[in-house]
């Protein structure tokens, strides 16, 4: 795992660190594509102690993080792989216990649960042709038509709570939406789609602006690699993607 340096600390404190997610949060440690464990790092400058707790240790204080540099704590957990639920247990100097989801988590539990989830992305994009064309695209001279949508309410489907029960709303997954969205956009000659917030948020009824995880695509529609599939397929269809 990459070391957290004085330079990282300087740019983090000044608000200028543009790749902080590469060093903070939970990262798989691999050797020849085999996951050996997970490295955790979190910034908790006012903590006395910090623990990583989760399903893997029965949510107990068996994995204490080490102070690394000026309020940054880190820990490597051997053998911990993808899709493990976890939180940080922060002990304050006056003895209070505070349970926190990871602000740099790449995946989260489905609401109403609130834990973060380790995640190993394996997706390989195949949109290089579109990416190359984007460099040459002149927005001042070529048409731009943007379709804005909220994934949670677009093309809603309904399922029964139980046999003979009243129908209830259900979400399409990222993969379910992909062919439907591409067809709609192409039929109506849109060049781009703008997705209302798809980062993790607590309320199904909201548009997603109450963000609880800026690096975590909401799990109500599926896994992060399934979102990557959606973006990849849109690009391959010649459609740009804007994230609100």
Model-derived features with residue positions:
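Residues that line or immediately flank small-molecule/substrate-binding pockets and catalytic motifs
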Residues: 54, 153, 197
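Short beta-strand elements bearing conserved aromatic residues within extracellular beta-rich modules
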Residues: 50-52, 86
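C-terminal EAL-domain catalytic cores of bacterial cyclic di-GMP phosphodiesterases
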Residues: 224-243
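Short proline/glycine-enriched turn/loop motifs at strand-loop junctions of beta-rich domains
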Residues: 43-50, 57-59, 81
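Hydrophobic faces of well-ordered beta-strands that scaffold small-molecule active sites
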Residues: 145-149, 193-195, 241-243
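The feature marks proteins involved in alpha-glucan
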Residues: 1-39, 60, 67-148, 153-165, ...
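Short amphipathic alpha-helices and their capping/turn segments at secondary-structure boundaries
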Residues: 133-137, 178-189
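Aromatic-lined carbohydrate-binding/catalytic grooves of carbohydrate-active enzymes
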Residues: 156-172, 183-228
């Amino acid at each position: 795992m990459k070391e957290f340096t004085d330079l990282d600390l300087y740019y983090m404190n000044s608000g200028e660190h543009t790749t902080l997610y590469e060093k903070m949060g939970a990262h798989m440690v691999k050797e020849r594509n085999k996951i050996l464990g997970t490295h955790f790092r979190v910034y908790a400058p006012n903590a006395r102690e910090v623990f990583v707790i989760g399903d893997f240790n029965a949510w107990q204080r068996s994995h204490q993080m080490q102070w690394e540099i000026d309020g940054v704590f880190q820990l490597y957990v051997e053998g911990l792989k993808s899709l493990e639920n976890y939180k940080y247990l922060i002990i304050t100097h006056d003895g209070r216990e505070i349970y926190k989801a990871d602000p740099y988590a790449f995946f989260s539990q489905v609401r109403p649960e609130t834990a973060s989830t380790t995640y190993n992305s394996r997706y390989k994009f195949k949109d290089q042709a579109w990416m190359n064309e984007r460099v040459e695209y002149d927005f001042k001279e070529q048409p731009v038509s943007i379709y804005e949508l909220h994934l949670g309410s677009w093309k809603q489907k309904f399922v029964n709570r139980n046999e003979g029960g009243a129908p209830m709303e259900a979400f399409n997954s990222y993969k379910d939406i992909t062919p439907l969205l591409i067809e709609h956009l192409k039929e109506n000659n849109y060049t781009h789609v703008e997705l209302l917030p798809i980062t993790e948020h607590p309320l199904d009824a909201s548009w997603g602006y109450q963000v609880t995880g800026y690096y975590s695509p909401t799990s109500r529609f599926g896994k992060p690699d399934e979102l990557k599939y959606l973006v990849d397929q849109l690009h391959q269809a010649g459609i740009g993607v804007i994230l609100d």
